[in-house]
Amino acid sequence: MKKFIHIDMDCFYAAVEMRDNPKLANVPLAIGGNSRRGVLSTANYIAREYGVRSAMSNYHAKQLCPDLVIVPGRMAVYKDVSTQIRAVFSRYTDLIEPLSLDEAYLDVTHSEQCKGSATLIAQQIRADIYNATGLTASAGIAPIKFIAKIASDENKPNGQFVVLPDQVDAFLAQLPLGKIPGVGKVTLEKLNLKGLYTGQDVRKKGVNWMQQHVGNFGVSLYQKCAGEHIGRVSTERVRKSLSVEHTYEYNKNSLQECLEQLPSLLEELTTRLNKQQLQNQVNKLSVKVKFANFVVTSADQAHQQLNSDIFSELLAKAYQRGLQQPVRLLGIGVGIKNQPQHNLQLSILDM
Protein backbone atom coordinates (compact mmCIF):
# COMPACT_ATOMS: atom_id res chain seq x y z
CA MET A 1 0.00 0.00 0.00
CA LYS A 2 1.39 3.38 -1.06
CA LYS A 3 1.55 6.40 1.24
CA PHE A 4 1.24 9.78 -0.47
CA ILE A 5 1.34 13.24 1.09
CA HIS A 6 0.33 16.40 -0.75
CA ILE A 7 1.70 19.57 0.86
CA ASP A 8 0.15 22.91 -0.08
CA MET A 9 1.34 26.16 1.49
CA ASP A 10 -1.43 28.48 2.68
CA CYS A 11 -1.78 31.54 0.34
CA PHE A 12 2.00 31.32 -0.04
CA TYR A 13 3.01 34.62 -1.69
CA ALA A 14 0.63 36.64 0.46
CA ALA A 15 1.75 34.77 3.59
CA VAL A 16 5.38 35.68 2.90
CA GLU A 17 4.43 39.34 2.52
CA MET A 18 2.42 39.30 5.76
CA ARG A 19 5.30 37.64 7.57
CA ASP A 20 7.79 40.23 6.37
CA ASN A 21 5.48 43.21 6.90
CA PRO A 22 3.20 42.72 9.95
CA LYS A 23 1.18 45.80 8.94
CA LEU A 24 -0.27 43.65 6.15
CA ALA A 25 -1.32 40.81 8.44
CA ASN A 26 -4.88 41.98 9.10
CA VAL A 27 -5.82 43.71 5.86
CA PRO A 28 -7.19 42.29 2.60
CA LEU A 29 -4.04 41.65 0.59
CA ALA A 30 -3.22 40.47 -2.93
CA ILE A 31 -0.06 40.02 -4.96
CA GLY A 32 0.04 41.51 -8.45
CA GLY A 33 1.13 44.34 -10.69
CA ASN A 34 0.33 47.94 -9.87
CA SER A 35 -1.65 48.72 -13.02
CA ARG A 36 -5.43 48.37 -13.13
CA ARG A 37 -5.00 45.88 -15.99
CA GLY A 38 -2.67 43.65 -14.01
CA VAL A 39 -3.66 40.17 -12.88
CA LEU A 40 -3.46 38.91 -9.30
CA SER A 41 -1.19 35.98 -8.44
CA THR A 42 -2.87 35.19 -5.13
CA ALA A 43 -4.77 36.76 -2.25
CA ASN A 44 -4.87 36.24 1.50
CA TYR A 45 -7.89 34.73 3.22
CA ILE A 46 -9.30 38.10 4.27
CA ALA A 47 -9.41 39.21 0.63
CA ARG A 48 -10.89 35.87 -0.44
CA GLU A 49 -13.87 36.52 1.82
CA TYR A 50 -14.74 39.38 -0.56
CA GLY A 51 -14.51 37.06 -3.58
CA VAL A 52 -11.00 38.12 -4.60
CA ARG A 53 -9.21 35.27 -6.38
CA SER A 54 -6.00 34.54 -8.25
CA ALA A 55 -6.00 35.34 -12.00
CA MET A 56 -8.52 38.14 -11.36
CA SER A 57 -7.78 41.57 -12.80
CA ASN A 58 -6.76 44.30 -10.35
CA TYR A 59 -9.72 46.38 -11.48
CA HIS A 60 -12.25 43.64 -10.80
CA ALA A 61 -10.66 42.82 -7.45
CA LYS A 62 -10.84 46.46 -6.36
CA GLN A 63 -14.51 46.56 -7.29
CA LEU A 64 -15.15 43.59 -5.00
CA CYS A 65 -12.91 44.89 -2.22
CA PRO A 66 -12.19 48.65 -2.38
CA ASP A 67 -9.77 48.43 0.57
CA LEU A 68 -7.70 45.71 -1.08
CA VAL A 69 -3.94 46.28 -0.76
CA ILE A 70 -2.05 45.07 -3.83
CA VAL A 71 1.72 44.65 -3.53
CA PRO A 72 4.16 43.55 -6.25
CA GLY A 73 5.51 40.04 -6.06
CA ARG A 74 9.07 39.34 -4.90
CA MET A 75 9.89 36.16 -6.78
CA ALA A 76 13.46 35.93 -5.55
CA VAL A 77 12.22 35.91 -1.96
CA TYR A 78 9.56 33.30 -2.71
CA LYS A 79 12.16 31.07 -4.34
CA ASP A 80 14.44 31.34 -1.32
CA VAL A 81 11.59 30.34 0.99
CA SER A 82 10.66 27.52 -1.38
CA THR A 83 14.21 26.21 -1.11
CA GLN A 84 13.83 26.11 2.67
CA ILE A 85 10.61 24.14 2.28
CA ARG A 86 12.22 21.70 -0.12
CA ALA A 87 14.99 21.10 2.43
CA VAL A 88 12.34 20.08 4.96
CA PHE A 89 10.83 17.59 2.51
CA SER A 90 14.24 16.04 1.91
CA ARG A 91 14.53 15.05 5.58
CA TYR A 92 11.67 12.61 5.14
CA THR A 93 11.92 11.26 1.58
CA ASP A 94 13.82 11.57 -1.69
CA LEU A 95 10.63 11.00 -3.69
CA ILE A 96 9.45 14.58 -4.12
CA GLU A 97 7.38 15.96 -7.02
CA PRO A 98 7.10 19.76 -6.87
CA LEU A 99 4.08 21.17 -8.67
CA SER A 100 4.95 24.82 -8.02
CA LEU A 101 6.89 26.95 -5.56
CA ASP A 102 4.36 26.18 -2.83
CA GLU A 103 3.02 22.72 -3.58
CA ALA A 104 4.44 19.20 -3.84
CA TYR A 105 3.68 15.50 -3.71
CA LEU A 106 5.75 13.26 -1.44
CA ASP A 107 5.89 9.46 -1.49
CA VAL A 108 6.69 8.33 2.07
CA THR A 109 5.83 4.67 1.57
CA HIS A 110 9.26 3.51 2.65
CA SER A 111 10.13 6.34 5.03
CA GLU A 112 11.12 5.19 8.50
CA GLN A 113 10.55 8.63 10.02
CA CYS A 114 7.79 8.89 12.65
CA LYS A 115 7.64 5.08 12.79
CA GLY A 116 6.49 5.03 9.17
CA SER A 117 3.22 6.86 9.87
CA ALA A 118 2.34 9.10 6.92
CA THR A 119 -0.06 11.04 9.13
CA LEU A 120 2.64 11.81 11.69
CA ILE A 121 5.17 12.58 8.94
CA ALA A 122 2.79 15.16 7.43
CA GLN A 123 2.20 16.67 10.84
CA GLN A 124 5.93 16.91 11.52
CA ILE A 125 6.68 18.35 8.07
CA ARG A 126 4.13 21.09 8.66
CA ALA A 127 5.68 21.86 12.04
CA ASP A 128 9.18 21.90 10.55
CA ILE A 129 8.08 24.25 7.77
CA TYR A 130 6.59 26.63 10.31
CA ASN A 131 9.72 26.54 12.46
CA ALA A 132 11.94 27.19 9.43
CA THR A 133 9.86 29.84 7.68
CA GLY A 134 7.11 31.09 9.99
CA LEU A 135 4.55 29.96 7.39
CA THR A 136 1.74 27.43 7.62
CA ALA A 137 1.03 24.54 5.29
CA SER A 138 -1.88 22.17 4.77
CA ALA A 139 -1.57 18.49 3.92
CA GLY A 140 -3.54 15.62 2.48
CA ILE A 141 -2.60 12.01 3.16
CA ALA A 142 -3.92 9.04 1.18
CA PRO A 143 -2.93 5.72 -0.44
CA ILE A 144 -3.83 7.20 -3.85
CA LYS A 145 -1.93 10.18 -5.20
CA PHE A 146 -4.72 12.40 -6.53
CA ILE A 147 -6.83 11.78 -3.43
CA ALA A 148 -3.99 13.22 -1.33
CA LYS A 149 -4.21 16.43 -3.38
CA ILE A 150 -7.96 16.68 -2.89
CA ALA A 151 -7.57 15.94 0.82
CA SER A 152 -5.12 18.81 1.33
CA ASP A 153 -8.00 21.26 0.70
CA GLU A 154 -10.29 19.71 3.29
CA ASN A 155 -8.87 21.39 6.41
CA LYS A 156 -7.25 24.53 5.01
CA PRO A 157 -5.65 26.62 6.32
CA ASN A 158 -3.03 25.06 8.58
CA GLY A 159 -4.63 21.64 8.80
CA GLN A 160 -4.45 18.16 7.36
CA PHE A 161 -6.87 15.46 6.30
CA VAL A 162 -6.32 11.72 6.05
CA VAL A 163 -8.13 9.25 3.80
CA LEU A 164 -7.36 5.80 5.17
CA PRO A 165 -7.21 2.75 2.87
CA ASP A 166 -10.57 1.43 4.08
CA GLN A 167 -12.14 4.86 3.48
CA VAL A 168 -11.08 5.21 -0.16
CA ASP A 169 -14.13 3.52 -1.68
CA ALA A 170 -16.65 5.67 0.18
CA PHE A 171 -14.58 8.83 -0.38
CA LEU A 172 -14.51 8.27 -4.15
CA ALA A 173 -18.19 7.32 -4.34
CA GLN A 174 -19.38 10.66 -2.96
CA LEU A 175 -16.62 12.75 -4.56
CA PRO A 176 -17.91 15.57 -6.82
CA LEU A 177 -16.23 15.13 -10.20
CA GLY A 178 -15.20 18.79 -10.26
CA LYS A 179 -12.74 18.11 -7.45
CA ILE A 180 -10.77 15.56 -9.49
CA PRO A 181 -7.56 17.03 -10.98
CA GLY A 182 -7.98 17.39 -14.73
CA VAL A 183 -11.75 17.94 -14.63
CA GLY A 184 -12.16 21.60 -15.50
CA LYS A 185 -15.27 23.72 -15.80
CA VAL A 186 -16.02 22.87 -19.44
CA THR A 187 -15.37 19.15 -18.96
CA LEU A 188 -17.54 19.12 -15.85
CA GLU A 189 -20.43 20.71 -17.73
CA LYS A 190 -20.20 18.00 -20.41
CA LEU A 191 -20.10 15.25 -17.78
CA ASN A 192 -23.11 16.76 -16.00
CA LEU A 193 -25.06 16.72 -19.26
CA LYS A 194 -24.49 12.95 -19.34
CA GLY A 195 -25.81 12.61 -15.80
CA LEU A 196 -22.39 12.28 -14.21
CA TYR A 197 -21.89 14.25 -11.01
CA THR A 198 -20.03 12.00 -8.56
CA GLY A 199 -17.58 9.14 -8.55
CA GLN A 200 -20.47 6.75 -7.92
CA ASP A 201 -22.22 7.96 -11.08
CA VAL A 202 -19.12 7.13 -13.12
CA ARG A 203 -18.69 3.72 -11.52
CA LYS A 204 -22.32 2.79 -12.23
CA LYS A 205 -21.85 3.52 -15.93
CA GLY A 206 -18.84 1.20 -16.21
CA VAL A 207 -15.60 1.56 -18.12
CA ASN A 208 -17.03 0.49 -21.50
CA TRP A 209 -19.81 3.07 -21.37
CA MET A 210 -17.35 5.75 -20.30
CA GLN A 211 -15.05 4.98 -23.21
CA GLN A 212 -17.91 4.94 -25.69
CA HIS A 213 -19.47 8.20 -24.52
CA VAL A 214 -16.52 10.16 -23.10
CA GLY A 215 -13.52 8.68 -24.94
CA ASN A 216 -10.09 7.90 -23.54
CA PHE A 217 -10.52 10.55 -20.88
CA GLY A 218 -13.57 8.63 -19.74
CA VAL A 219 -11.46 5.53 -19.19
CA SER A 220 -8.96 7.49 -17.11
CA LEU A 221 -11.78 9.09 -15.12
CA TYR A 222 -13.36 5.70 -14.46
CA GLN A 223 -10.05 4.31 -13.22
CA LYS A 224 -9.73 7.21 -10.79
CA CYS A 225 -13.29 6.88 -9.53
CA ALA A 226 -12.87 3.12 -9.12
CA GLY A 227 -9.67 3.54 -7.10
CA GLU A 228 -7.58 1.85 -9.79
CA HIS A 229 -5.37 4.87 -10.55
CA ILE A 230 -2.84 4.75 -7.71
CA GLY A 231 -0.35 7.16 -9.30
CA ARG A 232 3.33 7.66 -8.62
CA VAL A 233 5.55 10.53 -7.61
CA SER A 234 7.60 11.62 -10.62
CA THR A 235 11.00 13.06 -9.81
CA GLU A 236 11.62 13.98 -13.45
CA ARG A 237 9.59 15.86 -15.97
CA VAL A 238 9.78 16.57 -19.68
CA ARG A 239 8.88 20.13 -20.56
CA LYS A 240 6.35 20.07 -23.40
CA SER A 241 6.05 23.80 -24.04
CA LEU A 242 7.39 27.19 -23.09
CA SER A 243 5.62 30.53 -23.45
CA VAL A 244 5.57 34.16 -22.41
CA GLU A 245 2.64 36.56 -22.29
CA HIS A 246 1.87 40.13 -21.28
CA THR A 247 -1.35 41.79 -20.13
CA TYR A 248 -1.28 45.41 -21.27
CA GLU A 249 -2.34 48.41 -19.20
CA TYR A 250 -4.10 49.83 -22.24
CA ASN A 251 -5.80 47.79 -24.95
CA LYS A 252 -4.13 47.37 -28.33
CA ASN A 253 -6.65 48.66 -30.85
CA SER A 254 -5.17 47.47 -34.12
CA LEU A 255 -3.21 44.60 -35.62
CA GLN A 256 -0.26 46.93 -36.13
CA GLU A 257 -0.17 47.80 -32.43
CA CYS A 258 -0.16 44.09 -31.64
CA LEU A 259 2.61 43.35 -34.13
CA GLU A 260 4.75 46.03 -32.49
CA GLN A 261 4.73 43.98 -29.27
CA LEU A 262 6.25 40.90 -30.91
CA PRO A 263 9.95 41.88 -30.70
CA SER A 264 9.90 42.24 -26.91
CA LEU A 265 7.92 39.02 -26.48
CA LEU A 266 10.29 37.20 -28.80
CA GLU A 267 13.32 38.49 -26.90
CA GLU A 268 11.87 37.26 -23.62
CA LEU A 269 11.00 33.86 -25.08
CA THR A 270 14.47 33.49 -26.58
CA THR A 271 16.08 34.26 -23.23
CA ARG A 272 13.98 31.63 -21.48
CA LEU A 273 14.69 29.01 -24.14
CA ASN A 274 18.42 29.62 -23.92
CA LYS A 275 18.34 29.47 -20.13
CA GLN A 276 16.64 26.06 -20.29
CA GLN A 277 18.97 24.96 -23.14
CA LEU A 278 15.96 24.16 -25.29
CA GLN A 279 16.64 26.42 -28.26
CA ASN A 280 17.29 23.41 -30.52
CA GLN A 281 14.27 21.42 -29.35
CA VAL A 282 11.49 23.55 -30.84
CA ASN A 283 8.82 21.77 -32.89
CA LYS A 284 5.94 24.25 -32.93
CA LEU A 285 5.29 28.01 -32.73
CA SER A 286 2.12 29.43 -31.23
CA VAL A 287 0.41 32.75 -30.53
CA LYS A 288 -2.26 33.52 -27.93
CA VAL A 289 -4.59 36.52 -28.00
CA LYS A 290 -7.06 37.61 -25.30
CA PHE A 291 -9.52 40.26 -26.43
CA ALA A 292 -11.12 42.99 -24.33
CA ASN A 293 -14.26 40.84 -23.96
CA PHE A 294 -12.01 38.15 -22.41
CA VAL A 295 -12.45 35.76 -25.33
CA VAL A 296 -9.19 33.86 -25.91
CA THR A 297 -7.96 32.42 -29.19
CA SER A 298 -4.70 30.91 -30.40
CA ALA A 299 -2.95 29.83 -33.56
CA ASP A 300 0.03 27.54 -34.09
CA GLN A 301 2.22 26.06 -36.79
CA ALA A 302 4.80 23.30 -36.85
CA HIS A 303 8.30 24.77 -37.16
CA GLN A 304 11.76 23.84 -35.93
CA GLN A 305 13.05 27.23 -34.78
CA LEU A 306 11.94 30.68 -33.70
CA ASN A 307 10.80 32.77 -36.64
CA SER A 308 9.44 36.30 -36.30
CA ASP A 309 7.67 36.17 -39.68
CA ILE A 310 5.72 33.06 -38.70
CA PHE A 311 4.79 34.59 -35.35
CA SER A 312 3.53 37.66 -37.25
CA GLU A 313 1.42 35.49 -39.56
CA LEU A 314 -0.03 33.55 -36.63
CA LEU A 315 -0.82 36.77 -34.78
CA ALA A 316 -2.62 38.18 -37.81
CA LYS A 317 -4.62 34.96 -38.12
CA ALA A 318 -5.64 35.01 -34.47
CA TYR A 319 -6.38 38.75 -34.47
CA GLN A 320 -8.84 38.43 -37.36
CA ARG A 321 -11.03 36.14 -35.26
CA GLY A 322 -11.70 39.01 -32.85
CA LEU A 323 -13.64 41.03 -35.43
CA GLN A 324 -11.84 44.26 -34.50
CA GLN A 325 -12.14 43.70 -30.74
CA PRO A 326 -9.36 45.48 -28.79
CA VAL A 327 -6.65 43.20 -27.40
CA ARG A 328 -5.72 43.09 -23.68
CA LEU A 329 -3.18 40.21 -23.69
CA LEU A 330 -0.66 38.76 -26.13
CA GLY A 331 1.46 35.67 -25.75
CA ILE A 332 3.82 33.59 -27.84
CA GLY A 333 5.19 30.15 -27.19
CA VAL A 334 6.84 27.04 -28.56
CA GLY A 335 6.25 23.32 -28.39
CA ILE A 336 9.20 21.24 -27.19
CA LYS A 337 10.30 17.94 -28.70
CA ASN A 338 9.72 14.99 -26.40
CA GLN A 339 13.23 13.64 -26.04
CA PRO A 340 14.26 11.76 -22.89
CA GLN A 341 17.77 13.14 -22.89
CA HIS A 342 16.29 16.57 -22.24
CA ASN A 343 14.39 15.55 -19.14
CA LEU A 344 14.71 18.23 -16.51
CA GLN A 345 15.34 17.33 -12.90
CA LEU A 346 12.41 18.55 -10.87
CA SER A 347 13.22 21.58 -8.83
CA ILE A 348 10.84 23.82 -6.97
CA LEU A 349 12.78 26.70 -8.49
CA ASP A 350 11.94 25.50 -12.02
CA MET A 351 8.20 25.48 -11.54
From Swiss-Prot:
Superkingdom, taxonomy of origin: Bacteria
Q: Which GO terms describe its cellular component?
A: cytosol
Q: Which InterPro entries match?
A: DNA/RNA_pol_sf, DNA_pol_Y-fam_lit_finger_sf, DNA_pol_Y-fam_little_finger, DNA_polymerase-Y, DNApol_IV, PolY_HhH_motif, Rev_trsase/Diguanyl_cyclase, UmuC
Q: Which UniProt keywords apply?
A: Cytoplasm, DNA damage, DNA repair, DNA replication, DNA-binding, DNA-directed DNA polymerase, Magnesium, Metal-binding, Mutator protein, Nucleotidyltransferase, Transferase
Entry's EC annotation: 2.7.7.7
List GO molecular-function terms, semicolon-separated: damaged DNA binding; DNA-directed DNA polymerase activity; magnesium ion binding
Q: What class of enzyme is it?
A: transferase
User: Example GO biological process term?
Assistant: error-prone translesion synthesis
**Start and end of every UmuC domain?**
4-184
Q: Which cofactor does it need?
A: Mg(2+)
Coarse class of the protein's main subcellular location: cytoplasm
Q: List localization entries.
A: Cytoplasm
PROSITE patterns reported in the protein's UniProt record: UMUC (PS50173)
Where along the chain is the active site annotated? 103
Q: Which residues bind Mg(2+)?
A: 8, 102
Q: Its catalytic activity?
A: DNA(n) + a 2'-deoxyribonucleoside 5'-triphosphate = DNA(n+1) + diphosphate
The record's listing under CDD domains reads: PolY_Pol_IV_kappa
Q: Cofactor note, please?
A: Binds 2 magnesium ions per subunit.
List residue numbers at the site (Substrate discrimination): 13
Q: What does this protein do?
A: Poorly processive, error-prone DNA polymerase involved in untargeted mutagenesis. Copies undamaged DNA at stalled replication forks, which arise in vivo from mismatched or misaligned primer ends. These misaligned primers can be extended by PolIV. Exhibits no 3'-5' exonuclease (proofreading) activity. May be involved in translesional synthesis, in conjunction with the beta clamp from PolIII.
What is the protein's quaternary organization? Monomer.
Similarity comment text for this entry: Belongs to the DNA polymerase type-Y family.
Protein name per its UniProtKB record: DNA polymerase IV
What is the scientific name of the source organism? Pseudoalteromonas translucida (strain TAC 125)
